[in-house]
Amino acid sequence: MRIAEIVGKVTLGRVHPTLQGAQLKLAVPLTLEHLRGEKDPLDDEFLVVYDPFSTGVGEQIALSEGGEAAQPFYPELKPVDAYNAAILDSVHLRDQ
């Protein structure tokens, strides 16, 4: 599981039948450098995330990927690579 930030919405012209009515968001996974403000998140990779929570742009989420991203739908199968598992209220970093 990773921390990511929602940076936009995804709109599809055609959609797989199992994703009808789903909200898809564009997210950027955050590294420690991003969380400390040392690096701009928009310089890195973007992911399309299945979002069941209507998360807004700028919010941070807990992101599951791969096989774990499809587990909330079991036994139904959905073509999902990334899933918003939680909206994060805050993230606190400790210096070590």
Describe each region flagged by the PLM.
Residues 18-27:
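Short aromatic-glycine-enriched beta-strand elements
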Residues 39-47:
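Short, structured beta-strand/loop micro-motifs enriched in basic residues and often containing a Trp
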Residues 9, 30, 66-67:
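Short, surface-exposed secondary-structure boundary micro-motifs
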Residues 62-96:
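C-terminal structural segments of small proteins and small subunits
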